[in-house]
Amino acid sequence: SSASDVYKRQIEWLLRADMVHLCKLVTDVRFDLDDYARDDFFRAYTTDLSLLMAMKDFSLKQHIVENTLFGNSKGGIYECAIADALYKKGYPLYFYKNETTKRKIDVMIQKDGVVVPIEVKSGNTRANSLKSILKMNADIPYGYKFVDGNIGVSDDGIITLPLYMIAFI
């Protein structure tokens, strides 16, 4: 029995209360992602980042205010913010992870009939999995990389945008 089975009622309550939204694992990056989605493997993102921050230790908040936060904590907060913004724009959320190839994509959406992979970077801005997915899948013309930085476009189809530009996707 998976954790999703054990906590099914609690997860459903959180979903009905609109406190979280789910990002389902997909086993393939082809359109239609819903055909490859697994209901038993997912990430749960809060719909209210301020609630998440209220649950955190004061020292974490101090690091955020002083802009000295690094590592997984910063990346997790950024990823949650991006996922929440996409959810509020009406996109069903998916993520991709392949244990064999070690490729992973933070968030995947479908826009205008095309799969769009999205990476969220807080520190190391390399996006090897995104680059590989784009190279191996001709039907995915571009992908987004959201960073705490500036705009950029690479020859391999990666569009780099500052975090706040998620509003324009």
Where are these regions (language model features)?
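Active-site beta-strand-loop-beta-strand hairpin of nuclease catalytic cores
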Residues: 109-117
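Catalytic cores of nucleic-acid endonucleases
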Residues: 122-163
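Accessory nucleic acid-recognition modules appended to NTPase machines
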Residues: 1-104, 109
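Short catalytic-loop micro-motif centered on adjacent basic/acidic residues
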Residues: 95, 117-120
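Ser/Thr/Gly-rich flexible loops in soluble cytosolic domains mediating phosphotransfer, phosphorylation
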Residues: 163-169
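Short, basic, helix/turn surface patches
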Residues: 49-54, 120-128
